[in-house]
Amino acid sequence: MTGRKIIHIDMDAFYASVEQRDNPALRGKPIAVGHAEERGVVAAASYEARRFGVRSAMSSLKAKRLCPQLIFIPGRMEVYKSVSRQIHEIFHEYTDVIEPISLDEAFLDVTENKPGIPLAVDIAKEIKRKVRERLNLVASAGISYNKFLAKIASDYRKPDGLCTIHPAQALDFVARLPIESFWGVGPVTAKKMHTLGIHNGEQLRMQSLEMLTREFGKVGTVYYDFARGIDIRPVEAVRIRKSVGCEHTLEKDISKRSSVIIELYHAAVELVGRLEHANFRGNTLTLKIKFHDFSQITRSVTQSKELTALDVILPLAKQLLREVDYEHHPIRLIGLSVSNPREESDEKGVWEQLSFEFSDWELDE
């Protein structure tokens, strides 16, 4: 599959950049798109804010502690959607094989493209130039022969990045990657990798498939392939999203109510950030609990109104938690998801830690 030409386009600090573009007084200042009140969540942060450690899906209180001079700007989702449509108009000048990941991020398959341009990097350069000239915004682009490598490449030189990973370079490139840079490797998984002596892509590639699946379950197969630069997933032009969710694997099993509530709060904060960034609307909240013995349960509640705000989602999550006997069965994983019940005939895949929906990339980068 090394004959494919895949581009990953990622708008740099999209929501915040749109606000700074439209209001020159905000340029060069640390800003966060979101609400500053106690239960607020950062939906996006400018690069000036990121230098202080402010990140998407962070609670507004924590963001303000990290950066006291942080300026909060209410989100304008309709504006972001309009700008996203303009960006996609540029994409369609080159290909119709476009897989949107969120308003500010997409994969493009330009193996066969409308202008007949032979080099994908030249298409990426043109897209970046047109985005800057027409919209006064900055995009990063990664080019490779599969989606995993294209995504890694777009992250490599942000902001305003352009990076190509050729087939002959892939193994060396992946070998140098810190294990934390692999998609699907969060803090808990990274810590476990470190205890196994795995700190980078080269050390990951040295592990057998048997060992990785034994230690990490079926996602071990994904790690095995990624370490070898393998990703056979096609760019899918139609991508219907049925849910938005997040999971937190805990560093140690917990059964104390106060500890469980704290972890539930963190999951709810992250979920609200993901919902806002993905512009997703649903009215069913699902709580997933995995216990110390790896057994798991899910509990759901459906409301007549859409679930988007933390002060709505968190009380519902606590309500669902009351149905869980965690005092006698310690918890090792907590997950929350919002979905549309009309589309929930099949939940398979929604709660896999790696669902291949790029859920870990859908916060504003």
Predicted regions and their residues:
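DNA-contacting surface of Y-family translesion DNA polymerases
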Residues: 8, 181, 189-331, 340-364
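Short Gly/Ser/Thr- and Asp/Glu-enriched loop/turn motifs at secondary-structure junctions
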Residues: 101-105, 144-147, 280-284, 329-333
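Residues at or immediately flanking beta-strands
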Residues: 138-140, 286, 333-335
